[in-house]
Amino acid sequence: FNTSPEVAASSSAGTAYRPSIPADFQVEPFIRNAKSSFIRLQAANDSGDLDQIRDFTTPEMLDEISAEIKQRGNASQKTEVMFIDAHLLEVETTSDSAIASVRFTGQLRDGTDGEPESFDEIWHVQKDLKDPNASWLLAGIQQTA
């Protein structure tokens, strides 16, 4: 998923880019769930729990994460999310799907004695609008820093 929205672009007329978020979109519950999903996915990634990761990702993203987990082998991983903030950047909809871009910033610490490290990344999540029970699924991660 290489398509990423322009976060701070401006037009030739000099007007600032305004993200497209539908007026009826429930931003606060979405952000609350996005933060929870970030933390749960981090824990599932640390433990290599592909079943739990599958619940939060598209099949393509699951394949990428699975390959990363296999690459690290038996090396244990413990990441503490020390602080997280999230901002909804954009929501694009078609007749049958929606894609939302969420910018996560905060601090992570590897292990129990690692130094806190800042992170800044954009997650692209998608939802099947034809299925009333569909969840938002992680489709891509864009590192910004």
Regions found by a protein language model. Give the residues of each.
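Aromatic-residue hotspot detector
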Residues: 30, 38, 104-105, 119
